[in-house]
Amino acid sequence: MARRYDSRTTIFSPEGRLYQVEYAMEAISHAGTCLGILAEDGILLAAECRSTNKLLDSAIPSEKIYRLNDNMVCSVAGITSDANVLTSELRLIAQRYQFSYGEVIPCEQLVSHLCDIKQAYTQYGGKRPFGVSLLYMGWDNKYGYQLYQSDPSGNYGGWKATCIGNNFGAAISMLKQELADKENVKLTLADAKDLAIKVLSMTLDTTKLTPEKVEMATLQRVDNKTVYSVLEKPDVEKLIEKYTKVQAEAEAAKKEKQAKQPTK
């Protein structure tokens, strides 16, 4: 029955569903994982790299994380060619605003502009939705640090921590639990890095997390300037080693506790 309604973007099914939008969301759920965490002193984006071939040119820009302007960065999950179109459009929107008004575009306004375009592709015939979701991290004078997520339907929202891509449900559950445990504690960027490694280690479909499989970037304010930096492979490796050591110590303590328990 669904085949009657899923060939065109603009036709609702009897249940009120737009199948092409749902198929776009399904494509994203098979893409590499991306997660974002909002901290007190900055924002973190972390992403799974699936193109780890040693023949790839390391000078080519990031596979998953893109700088949009001086104050905003985004991470993508989904069809890469669609992501390239949308990131180019985001940069153009930001440049036009800065040229017209002489200041950097507010974060939410940039996200909203792009989502209007994405929503239009769910409403006009002869087009299909963009098969990509985006995470945006940014800073502006009004709201400070901000983390947003948008999907193929054109919907967007602000988050403290979220995830898109493969195994996003398990990752969001972990983030929710970890942040609930630290509800009364201010989360620093260093804590966010450790948390990102923990979540990726436990949710990626890989036997062992390596620096080649992870991209991490941070955004901070230093001396009244927004500073965007991508973590180098040795820095990521140190974070992975730290997590591995903590896990080994926790496992050893658990076994020791079990050994001390009296047998019935």
UniProtKB/Swiss-Prot annotation:
It comes from the Eukaryota. The proteasome is a multicatalytic proteinase complex which is characterized by its ability to cleave peptides with Arg, Phe, Tyr, Leu, and Glu adjacent to the leaving group at neutral or slightly basic pH. The proteasome has an ATP-dependent proteolytic activity. Signal peptide: none annotated. This is Proteasome subunit alpha type-4. CDD domains: proteasome_alpha_type_4. SUPFAM superfamilies: N-terminal nucleophile aminohydrolases (Ntn hydrolases). Belongs to the peptidase T1A family. It is found in: Cytoplasm; Nucleus. The 26S proteasome consists of a 20S proteasome core and two 19S regulatory subunits. The 20S proteasome core is composed of 28 subunits that are arranged in four stacked rings, resulting in a barrel-shaped structure. The two end rings are each formed by seven alpha subunits, and the two central rings are each formed by seven beta subunits. The catalytic chamber with the active sites is on the inside of the barrel. Interacts with PI31. The gene is Prosalpha3. The keyword Cytoplasm applies. GO terms for cellular component: cytoplasm; cytosol; nucleus; proteasome complex; proteasome core complex; proteasome core complex, alpha-subunit complex. The keyword tRNA processing does not apply. GO terms for biological process: proteasome-mediated ubiquitin-dependent protein catabolic process. Its main location: cytoplasm. InterPro entries: Ntn_hydrolases_N, Proteasome_alpha, Proteasome_alpha-type, Proteasome_asu_N, Proteasome_bsu_CS, Proteasome_sua/b. Keywords: Cytoplasm, Nucleus, Proteasome.
